[in-house]
């Protein structure tokens, strides 16, 4: 009867502890075999006095064996730096108690024994086998059997805390089991303000949200927001990677259990401290049917995770020490028939050292005006009033000329300039993507802006180069040079095949196509092809009906200057003597055989 009474009293204590909830946090009370209440476990109570907040859970007076715990000292918050190592030693204040835990899978209540925390320096090993703990003084199965002779020793797997600072210095591993009653937890932690100070208190405000519960799976998403995260250099935990960890003995384990009601989010703190975004994902498989295990079979271990603040942080206190996250061990880590599986994934993102206020604002000119290219000669060049610099023209071959477009602009061409521009036409019209200099009047493209500028003179009628012998003017210096050779009879360019000589190099290029049979210039209307661009220009005038050459005597018009010259012989005039009675083009310049564009016709 005594055992049944104690068992019913224990169940009542468990049920009462489940009802003591306030502000989304669960208060867990403990009881010993003699009925004397003691201090709740600091590793499972969210409002821990070690973190600067008083316990609001219903408590009673401490047991007679207590030597001065935090409950005896009142609800005042004590600084971490003033606490000695004995404050973290559960053997000095906390009697061997029966800790009450709430199992997630299936809603079953499980009972676990709470081991005393070990203080001092410990070593962690993250290998598969795990390292041995520095303290093996946990309660054995015999001690539990003497306390509860009729109850088997049952354990609960503790939940991995987000940022606990456990005095346990070892690491532990979990054995995989069958996923029967599984629970999946997803934590997102955003401590926007993290103040690293060795002597400050930790004042945290938290809220949680309880999501879904379907069948035997529960998904809980809790959001923990802390205004400041305390770090103190209390003890050393040396990991297996050889790096000295941060403060493992600075505070006890900290947990939060989500409830139906959520506390309001904390007010935003000042933006002067560096922030940290933490994404934590945990998958758990828990079972309520534990069997008796041997406490000495598997060494007690604690898993450890390190996080180091960014070294380039602007805050002077931000580079104090690293953060060690330690998880509490299993109480009886024997080989259970049904074991627990933990999967932990953390993603730490440190912010940039500069805040939003320090970033220079972008001006309209910076966003809309890109920087000019280094080589400005590669960009499209157009004279004033002719083209647009921002326009990149497509490639236009000489075979795509339209008769309607040529009827508007080709009246300014003369036969000699057409023949002199054969080489330029070959460079521009047959070019590819590297020739963006486009004439918007006739569609020709050129590789250089200077060549386009010279070509535009044929449309504008500008003729800055004049012959000193016959006062003829030309738009290009090369045309004037070729014209002067007609007076001197000089023909320096020769065909290597037939030894025929020419006064212009472009004439040799055109002549060589007669030997090779190449006809790159094709009419878009009748599909006829020609060896030079000037012949194609004359042919297109047949389709367009353009006749730029007019006789001054009878006002007859002709499409080619050669036809006008033959017409002038009908009038009995000597076309070679002077240009007083000769034909005059639309441009009004008096010269023998000249068209609108001016210049003479070379007949070889």
From Swiss-Prot:
Q: Which domain of life is it from?
A: Eukaryota
The Swiss-Prot or TrEMBL record annotates one GO molecular function as:
DNA-binding transcription factor activity, RNA polymerase II-specific
What this protein is reported to do is described as:
Transcription factor required for gene expression specific to photoreceptor cells.
* GO BP annotations, alphabetical order: circadian temperature homeostasis; compound eye morphogenesis; compound eye photoreceptor cell differentiation; compound eye photoreceptor fate commitment; entrainment of circadian clock; entrainment of circadian clock by photoperiod; photoreceptor cell differentiation; positive regulation of transcription by RNA polymerase II
Q: Does the keyword Aminoacyl-tRNA synthetase apply?
A: no
What's a Pfam family this protein contains? Answer: zf-C2H2
Keywords assigned by UniProt, alphabetized: DNA-binding, Metal-binding, Nucleus, Repeat, Sensory transduction, Transcription, Transcription regulation, Vision, Zinc, Zinc-finger
- Amino acid composition bias (Gly residues), ranges on this chain: 582-604
Q: What is its main location?
A: nucleus
InterPro entries xrefs = Zinc_finger (IPR050331), Znf_C2H2_sf (IPR036236), Znf_C2H2_type (IPR013087)
**Residues in coiled coil:** none
Compositionally biased region (Low complexity): 117-126, 200-237, 572-581
PANTHER family this protein is in?
GASTRULA ZINC FINGER PROTEIN XLCGF49.1-LIKE-RELATED, PR DOMAIN ZINC FINGER PROTEIN
Protein name, entry field? Protein glass
Q: Where is the composition biased (Acidic residues)?
A: 414-427
* Annotated localization: Nucleus
Name any GO cellular component annotation.
nucleus
Region described as Disordered: 111-139, 199-237, 359-400, 414-434, 566-604
PROSITE patterns in the record: ZINC_FINGER_C2H2_1, ZINC_FINGER_C2H2_2
Stored Gene3D superfamilies = Classic Zinc Finger
Q: Zinc finger (C2H2-type) residue ranges?
A: 437-459, 465-487, 493-515, 521-543, 549-571
